[in-house]
Amino acid sequence: MDHQDKAATVAMASRPQATQLQEPVTFRDVAVDFTQEEWGQLDPTQRTLYRDVMLETFGHLLSVGPDLPKPAVISQLEQGAELWVADRGGTGACHPGWILEPEDHTLLKDQGLPKMEPSPITEKDGFAKAVPCRSMIGIDQESDGQRQALKKDQSNLNDPKEIPLQSQSHKSLGLVEACVLGLNTYLLPDISGREYGCTYDSQVKNSEHNPSLVRQRTDSPATQSFDDNGSQKAFDQIMPITELTKSQVQDKPYKCTDCGKSFNHNAHLTVHKRIHTGERPYMCKECGKAFSQNSSLVQHERIHTGDKPYKCDECGKSFCHSTHLTVHRRIHTGEKPYECQDCGRAFNQNSSLGRHKRTHTGEKPYTCSVCGKSFSRTTCLFLHLRTHTEERPYECNHCGKGFRHSSSLAQHQRKHAGEKPYECRQRLIFEQAPALIKYEWTEPLGCDSPLSQGERTQRSDRPFKCNQCGKCFTQSSHLIRHQLTHSREEEPLRGRSRRQEQPCRRGSRLIQNTNSNSRELPVAQPKAGQASRTLALFDLREIMQEQNPVHVIGVEEPSVGNSMLFDTRESR
């Protein structure tokens, strides 16, 4: 009988067993037990690895069956307590995938197999930590030839070899012949990229096995190889689990019925569905804020505890979230990966780019529910809502006065501190910027001392100059308002025609009609409740329209570099 016939015989013999393995998997089937002596031989790193794997295994079982009760060992591991499992009859199991019954021990004793001895976790060839274990073989008691082959193979058990985790079990044999701290790859197709290996050494002929000895899913016989004697070849190399489970990772059988997104695990799908349902089962005990994931709650609790584990190496600033540190580092590196396609401006955050795009589109998605006014940012909407609610959250510590904005509070506190940060060209100091602007509108720019080079540069930025006092302005409209102050100071001249032209820089000028019948404009009197300094272009238009000889055709708002022209015509 050649190798292909033998492989076919093995496949046919294992088919009934494959049907039998469709039983519900319990935590006992995948748990790993250590005696007190064995637990004491593990170092802290190995115990931490054991804890992580056991908790992750139980989590995957919960994703399959949510009603699975929580074992006591899981509760102890979650609390971080030290534990050890009592010896179960003197035979320690190095793999949780199978449990030996009393009749199994008798069978092993009759077959002359050595007892299972756990070995410490080791590293080999740079791969992840693996758990060596002795292979347990199911024997056909009716075959004497296979008994002799078994005795021959027992001599090889003293020198175990490393095999890939994919060959966990073999249907042609009777028992699982690999172990990874209780890790079953058919239950855990993805374990966060960690790689495990296990020891294996067995060269035994095909035999029918005792079904009571196996409680583990088996691999396909097509993936197994046989030597000339029909026995399975020993594997002498370790392969990463990431390679072996690549097809399993790409397979996403769990699909969301709402949006069609697929996932590898049912637990991931359960968390994703909370986005559609709005369910937030994890609530903060401090502030009552709820979250859909436990990890989000843990990150939020750092706000209350003040824990900031992520520290910047450049400036030493700490953050409670790793994403905040990543964004902060772009300040030092100058990285701006988010670029606007309309103007080419770059930003270091995607949210900043989103806000910037609204300046091009004019979108204002945030609308006030009271008055209907829209805003492009949520912060602007929140500040606007305070005008309706009369909320003043910023209160002065000295006088108790409240303000809607923090900037208004800071401006108010300068009165108590006597701080005057605004300084004019004549070295006069003001508490607030509006007071400085008012002074510049009414007072000339002249200085007793010679101007410095910096002041000359600043003056050159004010091209509009008043001919009466020499004061300069940045905008022509400011010059017009300033000239009204001079007109109120002078006594109006009536019955006298004159031609007046006030040249300004950059071609700005005021042209009045030179007709002999034209008369001087009267003094503009401010209206009730209106400050004299607030007279603007529309006030000037009203004054000119009241006079019969002069009719205003139009007043154009000036801009820097353009002429300002008042077209006047004599009324007939």
Curated annotation (Swiss-Prot):
Q: Which GO terms describe its cellular component?
A: nucleus
Spell out the InterPro entries in the cross-references. Answer: KRAB, KRAB_dom_sf, Zinc_finger, Znf_C2H2_sf, Znf_C2H2_type
Is Zinc-finger one of the keywords?
yes
Q: Which UniProt keywords apply?
A: Isopeptide bond, Metal-binding, Nucleus, Repeat, Transcription, Transcription regulation, Ubl conjugation, Zinc, Zinc-finger
Tissue specificity is: Strongly expressed in testis, where it localizes to seminiferous tubules. Weakly expressed in heart, brain, lung, liver and kidney.
KRAB domain sequence ranges: 25-96
Renumbered to this chain, region (Disordered) spans 140-164, 205-231, 483-529
Q: Where are the zinc fingers (C2H2-type)?
A: 254-276, 282-304, 310-332, 338-360, 366-388, 394-416, 464-486
Q: Where in the cell is it found?
A: Nucleus
List all Polar residues biased stretches. Answer: 510-519
Q: Which Pfam families does this chain map to?
A: KRAB, zf-C2H2
Q: Per its UniProt record, what SUPFAM superfamilies does this chain match?
A: beta-beta-alpha zinc fingers (SSF57667), KRAB domain (Kruppel-associated box) (SSF109640)
Which biological process annotations from GO are given for this protein? Answer: BMP signaling pathway; negative regulation of transcription by RNA polymerase II
User: Is Zinc-finger tagged as a keyword?
Assistant: yes
| Compositionally biased residues, Basic and acidic residues | 150-162, 486-504
Q: Name one GO molecular function term.
A: zinc ion binding
Similarity annotation: Belongs to the krueppel C2H2-type zinc-finger protein family.
Q: What function is annotated for this protein?
A: Transcriptional repressor. May modulate BMP and TGF-beta signal transduction, through its interaction with SMAD proteins.
Q: How does it assemble?
A: Interacts with SMAD1 (via MH1 and MH2 domains). Interacts with SMAD5. Interacts weakly with SMAD2, SMAD3 and SMAD4.
According to UniProt, the name of this protein is: Zinc finger protein 8
What organism does the record attribute this protein to?
Mus musculus (Mouse)
